[in-house]
């Protein structure tokens, strides 16, 4: 008989939080018993999001009112610099899955440089597992604290890591061209700019300066046995709400064929359905 797990979601009314709740409600082993919010306590999620028929969900409560003894897992879907405050209070009291950037980077100084904010529990960074399931599956199974990867990094690491592990590509001139819908910027993004008839196009931003570069580099380097990895990262915003694609250009090492590449990805996909 499958186990049922009581699950809490803090920050359940943001874009990430609402999408997470949709996924969790379709999981046969999950019972959502707490939904946290910053500004909508006393309401139901269906009052905020009418894109899905939510059933049997608890009323929204203030994030700080969460009691970790009532749940088996807590997902924290709050912005960076806010999430770590909740983690500090909940650490060692419940299994934590954090969806912010607060625990993805191994080095606090790198975090501070990229996100421009202090960290209330930088000493806990070492206790978090980078939650890229297809790569770190066994580590995740044995960890009580998971840092969910960023959106751009996920789209980049999944294709590149298998190639690095097999030493199929040169590591000095990788070009990454990524495109994202504007939901990735969160609810505070100025949608009116995108919807303007004069701006119905996509555009690049933060070329080679995006804060996800450190996360991408950190995780790629863990699977690279030769020289330091050098890449350019060119992110773009598309004039649509959601979606992401990364096109990556690499130089193949000598004697690596198209079939070699396809076989690597087929094998990777076989074990990561």
Task: Please identify what each model-predicted range represents.
Residues 2-207, 226:
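N-terminal Rossmann-like NAD(P) cofactor-binding subdomain of oxidoreductases
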Residues 184-273:
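Charged docking surfaces used in two-component/phosphorelay signaling
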């Amino acid at each position: 008989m499958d186990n049922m797990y009581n699950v809490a979601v803090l920050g359940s009314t943001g874009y990430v939080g609402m999408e997470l709740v949709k996924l969790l409600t379709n999981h046969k082993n999950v019972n959502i018993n707490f939904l946290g919010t910053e500004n909508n306590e006393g309401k139901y999620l269906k009052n905020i999001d009418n894109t899905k028929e939510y059933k049997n969900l608890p009323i929204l409560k203030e994030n700080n009112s969460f009691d970790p003894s009532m749940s088996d897992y807590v997902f924290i879907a709050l912005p960076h610099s806010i999430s770590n405050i909740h983690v500090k209070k909940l650490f060692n009291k419940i299994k934590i899955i954090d969806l912010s950037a607060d625990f993805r980077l191994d080095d606090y100084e790198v975090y501070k440089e990229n996100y421009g904010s202090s960290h209330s529990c930088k000493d806990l960074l070492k206790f978090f597992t980078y939650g890229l399931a297809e790569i770190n599956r066994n580590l995740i199974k044995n960890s009580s604290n998971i840092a969910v990867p960023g959106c751009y990094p996920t789209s980049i690491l999944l294709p590149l890591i298998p190639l690095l592990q097999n030493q199929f590509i040169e590591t000095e001139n990788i070009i990454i061209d990524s495109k994202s819908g504007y939901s990735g910027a969160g609810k505070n993004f100025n949608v009116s700019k995108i919807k303007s008839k004069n701006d119905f196009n996509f555009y690049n931003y933060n070329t080679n300066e995006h804060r996800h570069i450190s996360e991408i580099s950190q995780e790629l380097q863990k699977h690279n046995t030769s020289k330091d990895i050098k890449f350019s990262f060119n992110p773009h915003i598309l004039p649509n709400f959601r979606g992401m694609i990364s096109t990556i250009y690499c130089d193949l090492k000598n004697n690596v064929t198209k079939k070699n590449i396809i076989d690597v990805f087929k094998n990777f996909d076989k074990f990561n359905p």
